[in-house]
């Protein structure tokens, strides 16, 4: 019997277009200014150091070329690390340091009123109904936990964070590795077979299924992946109830 619903965000509860066309460009545009403004902040400096360590260990040829260029040129630390972070954004690398910095930039954007998050039309209705039926709701996204909470706090329909009991990001583990899902079930203190995971990524569904979770593939218009392979697809979150009986 399913008791917990673990939800991806982008392409599952929120259109991919909001993330790709609004959130990512906003963080990309404001990255260098944010780092310059907060360079004295210990947490921000720690994230910059983490990104530097990641860069030096990065085996990707283009990342290595970028690092060699940084050592040759007389650029500032901020300019150099920004070039690497912009590179990670371009190649869609799931870097925890980058995700944390993006979350901090988005927080400022939300608080200034520059950003309001748009969810799928049925998302809030479905989440409320699940909550009313005593399902425990949790989030697992590649975006940082702070970014996840910001997205749900600043929706066009108000604050929805109270709907969720657990939040997980890539610091828990890679979303494409089955161990991450086992660890999540342990963190929620629930047998893995009692969890339903919903995502628009086949690789993530594969990993969750391997761990023992039930899975549904979010097949929405505009999502990058349109082939569910052997996973059960749903085109609307309301369809989720058909698989909880």
Swiss-Prot record:
Q: Write one Pfam family the protein is assigned to.
A: Hydrolase
**Is Metal-binding there in the keyword field?**
yes
Keywords, alphabetical = Amino-acid biosynthesis, Hydrolase, Magnesium, Metal-binding, Methionine biosynthesis
What does the record give as EC number?
Answer: 3.1.3.77
Q: Which SUPFAM superfamilies match?
A: HAD-like (SSF56784)
Q: Which InterPro entries match?
A: Enolase-ppase_E1, HAD-like_sf, HAD_sf
Instruction: Give GO MF terms, alphabetically.
Output: 2,3-diketo-5-methylthiopentyl-1-phosphate enolase activity; 2-hydroxy-3-keto-5-methylthiopentenyl-1-phosphate phosphatase activity; acireductone synthase activity; magnesium ion binding
| Biological pathway | Amino-acid biosynthesis; L-methionine biosynthesis via salvage pathway; L-methionine from S-methyl-5-thio-alpha-D-ribose 1-phosphate: step 3/6; Amino-acid biosynthesis; L-methionine biosynthesis via salvage pathway; L-methionine from S-methyl-5-thio-alpha-D-ribose 1-phosphate: step 4/6
Cofactor dependence: Mg(2+)
Q: Biological process GO annotation list?
A: L-methionine salvage from methylthioadenosine
| PANTHER family assigned to the protein according to its UniProt record, in alphabetical order | ENOLASE-PHOSPHATASE E1 (PTHR20371:SF1)
Q: What is known about its subunit structure?
A: Monomer.
Function statement:
Bifunctional enzyme that catalyzes the enolization of 2,3-diketo-5-methylthiopentyl-1-phosphate (DK-MTP-1-P) into the intermediate 2-hydroxy-3-keto-5-methylthiopentenyl-1-phosphate (HK-MTPenyl-1-P), which is then dephosphorylated to form the acireductone 1,2-dihydroxy-3-keto-5-methylthiopentene (DHK-MTPene).
Among NCBIfam families, the record links this protein to: enolase-ppase
State the name under which the record lists this protein: Enolase-phosphatase E1
Q: Which organism is it from?
A: Prochlorococcus marinus (strain MIT 9313)
Gene name in the database record? mtnC
């Amino acid at each position: 019997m399913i008791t917990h619903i673990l939800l991806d965000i982008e392409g599952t509860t929120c259109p991919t277009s909001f993330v790709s066309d609004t959130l990512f460009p906003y963080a990309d545009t404001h990255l260098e200014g944010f780092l310059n403004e907060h360079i004295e902040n210990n947490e921000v400096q720690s994230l910059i150091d983490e990104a530097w360590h990641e860069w030096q260990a990065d085996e990707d040829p283009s990342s290595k070329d970028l690092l060699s260029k940084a050592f040759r040129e007389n650029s500032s630390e901020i300019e150099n690390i920004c070039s690497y972070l912009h590179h990670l954004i371009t190649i869609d690398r799931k870097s925890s340091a980058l995700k944390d910095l993006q979350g901090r930039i988005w927080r400022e954007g939300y608080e200034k009123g520059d950003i309001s998050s748009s969810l799928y039309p049925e998302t809030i209705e479905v989440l409320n109904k699940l909550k009313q039926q005593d399902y425990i709701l949790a989030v697992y996204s590649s975006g940082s936990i702070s970014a996840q909470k910001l997205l749900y706090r600043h929706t066009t329909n108000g604050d929805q964070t109270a709907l969720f009991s657990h939040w997980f990001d890539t610091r828990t583990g890679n979303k494409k590795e089955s161990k991450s899902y086992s660890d999540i079930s342990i963190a929620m203190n629930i047998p893995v077979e009692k969890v339903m995971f919903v995502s628009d990524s086949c690789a993530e569904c594969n990993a969750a299924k391997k761990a023992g979770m039930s899975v549904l593939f979010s097949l929405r218009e505009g999502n990058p992946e349109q082939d569910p392979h052997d996973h059960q697809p749903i085109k609307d979150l309301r369809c989720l109830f058909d698989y909880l009986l």
